[in-house]
Curated annotation (Swiss-Prot):
Source organism per UniProt: Psychrobacter arcticus (strain DSM 17307 / VKM B-2377 / 273-4)
Gene, per the UniProt record: rpmB
Family to which the UniProt record says this protein belongs: Belongs to the bacterial ribosomal protein bL28 family.
Record has Ribonucleoprotein as a keyword: yes
Top-rank lineage group of the source organism: Bacteria
InterPro entries, per database record: Ribosomal_bL28 (IPR026569), Ribosomal_bL28/bL31-like_sf (IPR034704), Ribosomal_bL28_bact-type (IPR001383), Ribosomal_bL28_sf (IPR037147)
This protein's name: Large ribosomal subunit protein bL28
GO biological process entries: translation
Length: 78
């Protein structure tokens, strides 16, 4: 399972750990992903999505129905 938010498309980024002595080592910044079940009233069922916390806020703002329409338009099976 890839580390990608299904709503926002956030992916891991790469950067550096920087020590006090200014030594740099490569690291990954991972998105804050959660497997979350959302109740879809119109379909009378739960939908499981892998979303970041930013994606959860977008779902709270727009509603799960609008987000699912957008995901299905992109070709994701939900």
């Amino acid at each position: 399972m890839s580390r990608v938010c299904q709503v926002t498309g956030k992916r891991p980024m790469v950067g550096n750990n920087v020590s006090h002595a200014n030594n740099k080592t490569r690291r990954r910044f991972l998105p804050n992903l959660h497997n979350h079940r959302f109740w879809v009233e119109s379909e009378n069922r739960f939908v499981r999505l892998r979303v970041s916390t930013k994606g959860m806020r977008i779902i709270d703002k727009l509603g799960i129905d609008k987000v699912l329409v957008d995901l299905r338009a992109q070709g994701q099976k939900v």
